[in-house]
Amino acid sequence: QVLVDSGVGPALGEALTGLGLPIAITCFVLAAAVRIIQGSATVACLTAVGLVMPVIEQLNYSGAQMAALSICIAGGSIVVSHVNDAGFWLFGKFTGASEAQTLKTWTMMETILGTTGAIVGMIAFQLLS
């Protein structure tokens, strides 16, 4: 909420627009960055939405396009689950896996799942454009 209230959203939106990244990729990258740094998928989703909304609101996307962008954000929010994520520890403890094994299995599975979901969202967004 601090990031949203501080007005960093519009500034970040302008900076990302200046890079020329498509909005679907921007949504994925923002959510993934927050997820990797902070660990929570929920926080990653909400933060990414708060940061990209100023840009998205100006572009008049349809409901279907917004849904596709939501899929991109959701995908980014679950990639690279590691030691700062509660799910990482739950999986490891319930399965009896070591930290190294959990990184090889859980982290890889989450990354593949999130990336695949985001790619589907990006394709859907392009088809709806």
Please annotate each region the language model reported.
Residues 1-8, 24:
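Core transmembrane alpha-helical segments of multi-pass membrane transporters/permeases
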